[in-house]
Amino acid sequence: MAANISKLEAIIDNTPNSSPDPEVSHKLWVSSLNKFQYTLPLLISNFAGLGIAFIYCLIAFIREMSHPSSRKDTMEHGLPIILCSTLMLVGNILYYFLSKHPLKVTVPEDLVQIPMQQMSSPAQEAP
């Protein structure tokens, strides 16, 4: 494992403009896929919070356009926004916690299959 990491570091340090061999590219891809698990709770909670806030604002706009004389309590209008902000805050806390104490979930290399045709560059395929 340590030999593979040192091989990856040597290839990255010595050949920044050339593409590494397919085995190293595969390992780099699996490694980046494993790092994505830290940002997933942050992305889900932020997009969920933003989506709920957008839908609420759209509904409030339609309601206000159809009944302009009806006024609601400020807390009733602000509650969904407060809930969405709380959801995004929880996602940020989860992201911070998971980045400091990562889960021991990894993607097995056997499950991640990349065909060799996709890993070769177009310049190598053309005669």
UniProtKB/Swiss-Prot annotation:
The keyword Transmembrane applies. It comes from the Eukaryota. The chain crosses the membrane at residues 42-62, 78-98. It is a multi-pass membrane protein. Keywords: Membrane, Transmembrane, Transmembrane helix. It is found in: Membrane. This is Putative uncharacterized membrane protein C622.02. It comes from Schizosaccharomyces pombe (strain 972 / ATCC 24843). The lineage of its organism: Eukaryota, Fungi, Dikarya, Ascomycota, Taphrinomycotina.
